[in-house]
């Protein structure tokens, strides 16, 4: 296992098991059979999924069929999530700590990878196995083996890479078993209030606005500006739904899709 990162290192990647004794041991990788109930896998991981972090933001990728990419924004540059694990208190935020800023729900959030059924994004639901791993202090991988999509099985490997001097997270998707006509998607959510968003050339989806990340605490409102940009060679089309601005994606001849995720507080 790699050594814990420090603020000077500029990136960190964290995967922990949830522990009833609240030790939450760090692990290198985990994989669940496809038959595992989503809530069991989701709750088995502390923070509900792997975390990847640069000095400006952090992402966590949920360990379930949505594989939602949630966003944590910093008030001050540095690494925080080894301590906060996405669970910031109002008092800590008032003192300058970062916090999760999005209400995930059923949206694509910010750069989640999904299928597309011609109308909307679809989860990676029927799989033979699902896993996450920390490759090093700057890389997290997510794997779905044997995803049943459009009547055939696909193997998916998602790689998320952070950089010490950038707020951008690079995403590389490798697909094996894709057939002609298979279309996938990513994009950004529409925020609950004051939402502004859409698409810019050549291949970018963006949005900004406000929402209450925790439905149990509607009085705590956060603001976020989201941007996902894909390789123009991977862009098949764009689409807008009630929840999302979507980039519709096709893999290249080698099975790759590439895009970037970034977020900030609106100016």
Task: List each language-model region with its residue ranges.
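Extended, loop-rich substrate-binding clefts of extracytoplasmic carbohydrate-active enzymes
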Residues: 94-165
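Solvent-exposed N-terminal domain segments of exported/luminal and surface proteins
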Residues: 3-124
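A recognition module on extended beta-rich or small alphabeta surfaces enriched in W/G with H and D/E
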Residues: 81-84, 88, 200-235
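A short, structured loop/turn motif at beta-sheet edges
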Residues: 132-137, 163-165, 175-182, 250-256
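Beta-strand elements of well-folded, non-transmembrane domains
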Residues: 144-148, 162-166, 175-179, 190-192, ...
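Acidic (Asp/Glu-rich), glycine- and aromatic
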Residues: 156, 167-199
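Beta-strand-rich recognition/accessory modules
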Residues: 224-267
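Beta-strand secondary-structure signal
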Residues: 139-141, 157-159, 170-172, 185, ...
